[in-house]
Amino acid sequence: MIDPDGFRPNVGIILTNDAGQVLWARRINQDAWQFPQGGINPDETPEDALYRELNEEVGLERDDVEILACTRGWLRYRLPQRLVRTHSQPLCIGQKQKWFLLRLLSNEQRVRMDLTGKPEFDGWRWVSYWYPLGQVVTFKREVYRRALKELAPRLLTRD
């Protein structure tokens, strides 16, 4: 599902532990790391997509997490021209994302990246809250900065 402006609706997931660290996932067979994210299907709300993607990409269920916050609006990034599939219709030029800040309630050993036939990640680790800004692929950096900045106060006041 692509919107009229060419952006694919998507959810981004920032999963935190009790130490305030975030789950940082390695893309399968690559030296690229990112937060879990995924598209919103036509019949889904952003929250529905969040739980589906959380299970598909990280192996966690609804009961394993608590939603602490969500970004107020859509955050957009454009794909670099080399990644735009110019022969597909409708043309997708980027993603528009709702970002969710989650707290892990269960044991971290429940995190599994191999539950689907086509896993997106093959490793993960806990990193400091702001660490991803210096590590994520350049074209996603501004969206990460905006999401982390907007959601940070909720992490700091969660108790």
From Swiss-Prot:
GO terms for biological process: mRNA catabolic process. Its EC number is 3.6.1.-. CDD domains: NUDIX_Ap4A_hydrolase_plant_like. Residues 6-149 form the Nudix hydrolase domain. Its cofactor is a divalent metal cation. It is an enzyme of class 3 (hydrolase). A motif (Nudix box) lies at residues 38-59. PROSITE patterns: NUDIX, NUDIX_BOX. The keyword Transmembrane does not apply. It holds the Pfam family NUDIX. SUPFAM superfamilies: Nudix (SSF55811). One of its GO terms (molecular function) is mRNA 5'-diphosphatase activity. Keywords: Hydrolase. InterPro entries: Nudix_hydrolase, NUDIX_hydrolase-like_dom_sf, NUDIX_hydrolase_CS, NUDIX_hydrolase_dom, RppH. GO terms for cellular component: cytoplasm. Accelerates the degradation of transcripts by removing pyrophosphate from the 5'-end of triphosphorylated RNA, leading to a more labile monophosphorylated state that can stimulate subsequent ribonuclease cleavage. Belongs to the Nudix hydrolase family. RppH subfamily. This is RNA pyrophosphohydrolase. It comes from Pseudomonas putida (strain ATCC 700007 / DSM 6899 / JCM 31910 / BCRC 17059 / LMG 24140 / F1).
